[in-house]
From Swiss-Prot:
GO aspect biological process, one term: negative regulation of translation
Lineage summary: Bacteria, Bacillati, Bacillota, Clostridia, Eubacteriales
Protein family membership: Belongs to the universal ribosomal protein uL13 family.
Listed HAMAP family: Ribosomal_uL13
Quaternary structure (record): Part of the 50S ribosomal subunit.
Keyword list, A-Z: Ribonucleoprotein, Ribosomal protein
Protein encoded by which gene: rplM
Name of this protein: Large ribosomal subunit protein uL13
InterPro entries documented for this protein: Ribosomal_uL13, Ribosomal_uL13_bac-type, Ribosomal_uL13_sf
Length: 144
């Protein structure tokens, strides 16, 4: 019996909606990263993008445990000398709550070409509305 290797053309992609209301950032992000990679499928192949599309709604209602709202910092670089920008997560969740989930999920994906193609399948929205009704996404409840 030969080992099965998925080919990009034969991957059937589904759309899932995940509600982030009152979910912990890290636990939600690890579950989303697993779906984006395709680890929930029996055809999972590490070097092929076998994952599904994920829509995360209510990103503004995400929770952080402990005092991470004040202590944890979100950093990004503008590309210019001295361009390191830093803000705490309380400010980030007020200004751009989608960015908190995107950054957490991106850190859990492969840091290469494959990971960059996987992150494009993640759609995050701060409210409960999203423009992807035509794809007929199914609601997915998280474990735990």
């Amino acid at each position: 019996m030969k080992t099965y290797v998925a080919k990009p053309a034969e991957v059937d992609r589904k759309w899932y909606v995940i509600d982030a209301s009152d979910k912990t950032l890290g636990r939600l992000s690890s579950e989303v990263a697993s779906i984006l990679r395709g680890k929930h499928k029996p055809i999972f192949t590490p070097h092929v993008d076998t994952g599904d599309f994920v829509i995360v709604i209510n990103a503004a209602k995400i929770k952080l445990t402990g005092d991470k709202l004040n202590q944890k910092k979100f950093r990004h670089h503008t590309g210019y000398p001295g361009g390191l920008r830093e803000m705490d997560y309380r400010t980030l969740l007020q200004k751009r709550p989608e960015k908190a989930i995107e950054a957490a999920v991106q850190g859990m994906l492969p840091h290469n070409r494959l990971g960059r193609s996987m992150i494009k399948k993640l759609k995050v929205y701060s409210g409960s509305e999203h423009p992807h009704q035509a794809q007929k996404p199914e609601l997915r409840e998280l474990k735990g």
